[in-house]
Each structure stands twice: as C-alpha cells, then as structure tokens.
C-alpha cells in the first residue's frame, strides 16, 4: 500500500527528457510558491522523465495537480498527481518514482545507481536517500513493473518455489509412468500376457530360462510353472489364434529341446515326420508311438525330470493333459509337464472352436498342435483328419487312440488332475465341462493300460463317440471302456 506523502508534494511523470528543473519551476510556480523541485536523473545526469515538486501550501499543490494533469509540456503529455509513499520503504529511505516511459528493469536500476550511488535491494534508492525524502507518486503505471523483474528480495524467493516444484513433479510423474509401463510392455512382448498379469509374469521371467518360450527347462522351475501356467494360458490362446497352434506347440518343439536330446530329434524332425506320416500312412500319434514313444521310453529319465512340473502342471491342467496325453499317448508329456501345463488353455480354445471335447479334437486333429510340432500343424491336421491314415495306423498298431495312454506314465499324473483343475475351471470354464470327468477317468500306469475310473463314465461317453468316428475304429472305445489291457498291450507288442 502507498499512502499520501507530504500533502504539498506532487509527482510529475512523462516529462520530456529535455525538460529541466528550471522549466518545471517556471510552469508549476504559477499555482503557488514551490519549495523544491527534484528532477530524477540517471548516471549520465540525463533526465529519467519524472520529477517531484513540493509546494509550500498543500492547497496549491492540489490545484496544480488538477490543472496540469494531462496537459502537454514541451511536446509531451504529463501526469501530475499527489506523491505517494511506498509501503515497502525501509529505514526512512524511500523508493524513487519511476517514469512510465522507462519500464526497463535495467534502465531503472542503472538510473537509480547513477543518482544514488548503487543499490542493495530491488529498490533503486534503498542504498541512499533522496533529496526529496524518497517520495513516490501514486501512479498506476509500469513503474513498479519495471523494477519487479530484477528484485532479489524474499518475495521473489517465495514466489519461486511453486514453479520449481511443479516442474519436478511433472518430470517425476512422467518418470514414474515410464517406469511402470516399461516392464509391462516388455513382459507383454515376451509372454503375450494381458497387462493385469504382468507383475507375476515378470517373476516368471526370472525363474524361467532365458529363452522366451521359457517353459521347458528341466531346472526345477516348474513348480514355478504354476505361475507360468497362470499366465501362459492366455498367451497360449493368443498364439493358437494367431498361429494356428498353441504356444504349447512351440514349447513342445522348443521346450523339449531342453528336456532331452531325443526330444530335440523329435522336435526338429516334425516337418520331415509330417512327410513321413504321409508316406507311411500313420498319424503323428502313431509315429510317436513307433518312434517318439520309443524315445520317451528310452528316456524315462526325461519323465523323471518332469515330475516336479508334472505335479504342478498336472494339478492345473491334468484333466486336459489327460485328454491330451490320452489322445497323444503321452508322447510329449512325460518329457515335459510344462507343455501340458500350457496346453489346456489352447485346448480349451480348440474345444470352443471345434465344438467337441478335447478328446475329439485330438482325435480329429491328429495331435497336430498337441504333439508340440507347431510347424506341421496345418499339414498334420489335414493328414490326420483323413480317416485312412488313422485307420492304417489303428490297424497297424492294433489299437486306437486309447492305446497310447497305456504307454504313457499315468501314475505320475495321478488323481491330482481334477482337483488342480479347479484353477483352470475358473479361467477356462467351458474346458472344465469337457474335461471334468476325464481327469480321473484315465489313471494309467505305464504297465497298467488305461484303467478307467468308474466315477466318471458320463464324460467317457461324451468323449468317446467322436474318436470312434474320427478313426473309423471302435478299438479305442474298447481299449478304454473295458480297461483295454489286452488290446492296448497287443498294440504295444505290435509296435515294439
């Protein structure tokens, strides 16, 4: 706030630079006696364009202000008004008035220093006193605005922090946003997992092998595969939709590489194997029993590696596994439970797409994508869908799709299949319908062939008809429903 200074003191602004004290006194002396005329100058002793005039009689000052305000003096309109004291004066020292023409902070500062011998604060006159007592005019001019940018007082410090805080906060927000997003995108790239599951899949990153499929290592990570199981299924579903086969195929073909060298052979062989199937007229499943299953049996230690993941994987997707391994003859499963852990989602997807149980799907699809040879999926699918190849395979092996489970290591899958399937049921509700009873349905040991669990005959009936149609043989049903020991073992003897 500014208050009126000496009642007889006037501020005259907007003066011509050529106007001096004598001229001012001559002009304003007409209104009454003048006690003092103060023209503000810069260092070079040039007028800064404003002055203070003190009348001996305050009434004369008022009259002069009314008469001369807005009048032209030496070619310039001047402003005349009662001089005001600045509210921020300190120690009796007052800020000098500023001219509306001199709005530059540097100009104000220089002129103040020149006339007063330097300044210490943001007020030019704080270091020295004015002859007129430091009175300032009551102006609504840019007088103070010209000086504000250069002031170094507490007010500038108090005003400064908010911008400083806002900028870092914006940076921090952007940094924090980028920090949270980076890993999710990376995880999503690696695993195809929806963002909501990214946090745990990153843990999975650490536990899994460096390969992006990350499902097939024998290093005991498969107890952690439950997390993988939790997150891989969606990725499975995506992969299956995009590529026509599940990641399980990828993991079968890639993951088995980690399990056994024999797996590797089978994994790399599939394309030629697909041709071999066409040449020999038997399905991938048959070939897996004639070749792949031998590999599996020759490497039972592979199955020994898998149990940790089997326990977990089988609990989650055991039912689906059972179907798959049932339909696939455990060909890939003994060596990699991990694959079994990831297949169910994709099987569930296939089940929805094809409208029949996973059993039917595998029967009709010929285990093409369950075999773990994703590259041969389309080819194997078409080949296996042809009834002739399977009929030949069935006749050759003396058993249908059901015999392979006799060879599969059923005991390791145990009854844990169904109760762990509850997790999968939440995520894959429809798949549960098709797999629920099958979880306990096959409880096969390698030596005891495919004994059905009497608890779930309904799903057996639901599952069996399509395989029968797909293969053109009822030996599948016989081997499963009747226990199939003689028949499936006959198939084994024919194979081996």
From Swiss-Prot:
PANTHER family: TRANSFORMER-2 SEX-DETERMINING PROTEIN-RELATED
Name of the coding gene: RBMY1B
Organism of origin: Homo sapiens (Human)
Region annotation (Disordered) ranges: 67-349, 452-496
Free-text tissue specificity from the UniProt record: Testis-specific.
Protein name: RNA-binding motif protein, Y chromosome, family 1 member B
Keywords, comma-separated and alphabetical: mRNA processing, mRNA splicing, Nucleus, RNA-binding
One annotated GO biological process: positive regulation of mRNA splicing, via spliceosome
Reported function: RNA-binding protein which may be involved in spermatogenesis. Required for sperm development, possibly by participating in pre-mRNA splicing in the testis.
Miscellaneous field: The RBMY1 proteins are encoded by repeated regions of the Y chromosome, mostly within the AZFb region. The exact number of functional copies is unclear and may vary between individuals, and some of them may represent pseudogenes. The proteins are very similar, which makes the characterization of each protein difficult. Thus, most experiments do not discriminate between the different members. One can therefore suppose that reported interactions with a RBMY1 protein involve all the proteins.
Subunit-structure text: Interacts with splicing factor proteins SFRS3/SRP20, TRA2B/SFRS10, KHDRBS1/SAM68 and KHDRBS3.
Domain RRM as annotated: residue spans: 8-85
Main location: nucleus
Annotated Gene Ontology cellular component terms: nucleolus; nucleoplasm; nucleus; spliceosomal complex
């Amino acid at each position: 706030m500014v208050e009126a200074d000496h009642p007889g003191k006037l501020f005259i602004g907007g003066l011509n630079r050529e106007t001096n004290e004598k001229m001012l006194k001559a002009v304003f002396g007409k209104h009454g006696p003048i006690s003092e005329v103060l023209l503000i100058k810069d260092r070079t002793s040039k007028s800064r364009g404003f002055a203070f005039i003190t009348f001996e009689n305050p009434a004369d000052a008022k009259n002069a202000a009314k008469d001369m305000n807005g009048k032209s003096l030496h070619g310039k309109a001047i402003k005349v008004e009662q001089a005001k004291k600045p509210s921020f004066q300190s120690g009796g020292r007052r800020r000098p008035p500023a001219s509306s023409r001199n709005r530059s902070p540097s100009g104000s500062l220089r002129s103040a220093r020149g006339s007063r011998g330097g300044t210490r604060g943001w007020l030019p006159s704080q270091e020295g006193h004015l002859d007129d007592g430091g009175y300032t005019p009551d102006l609504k001019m840019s007088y103070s605005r010209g000086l504000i940018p250069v002031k170094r007082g507490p007010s500038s410090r108090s005003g400064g922090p908010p911008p400083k805080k806002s900028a870092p906060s914006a940076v921090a927000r952007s940094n924090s946003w980028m920090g949270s997003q980076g890993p999710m995108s990376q995880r999503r790239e690696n695993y195809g997992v929806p963002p909501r599951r990214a946090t745990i899949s990153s843990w999975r990153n650490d536990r899994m092998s460096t390969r992006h499929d990350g499902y097939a290592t024998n290093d005991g990570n498969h107890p952690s595969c439950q997390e993988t199981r939790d997150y891989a299924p969606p990725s499975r579903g995506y992969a299956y939709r995009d590529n026509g086969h599940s990641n399980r195929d990828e993991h079968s073909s890639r993951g088995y590489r980690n399990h056994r060298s024999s797996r590797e052979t089978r994994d790399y062989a599939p394309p030629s194997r697909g041709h071999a199937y066409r040449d020999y007229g038997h399905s991938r499943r048959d070939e897996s029993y004639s070749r792949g299953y031998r590999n599996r049996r020759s490497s039972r230690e592979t199955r020994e590696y898998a149990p940790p993941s089997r326990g977990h994987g089988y609990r989650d997707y055991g039912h689906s596994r059972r179907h798959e391994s049932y339909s696939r003859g455990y060909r890939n499963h003994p060596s990699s439970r991990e694959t079994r852990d990831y297949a169910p989602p994709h099987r569930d997807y296939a089940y929805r797409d094809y409208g029949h149980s996973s059993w039917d799907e595998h029967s009709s699809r010929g285990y093409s994508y369950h075999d773990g040879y994703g590259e041969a999926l389309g080819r194997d699918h078409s080949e296996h869908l042809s009834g002739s190849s399977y009929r030949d395979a069935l006749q050759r092996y003396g058993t249908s799709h059901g015999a392979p489970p006799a060879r599969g290591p059923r005991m390791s899958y145990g009854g844990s299949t169904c109760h762990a399937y509850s997790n999968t049921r939440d995520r894959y509700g429809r798949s549960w319908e098709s797999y629920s009873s099958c979880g306990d349905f096959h409880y096969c040991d390698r030596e005891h062939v495919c004994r059905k669990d009497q608890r779930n005959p309904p799903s057996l009936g639901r599952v069996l008809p399509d395989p029968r149609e797909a293969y053109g043989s009822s030996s599948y049903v016989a081997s499963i429903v009747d226990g199939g020991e003689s028949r499936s073992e006959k198939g084994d003897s024919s194979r081996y």
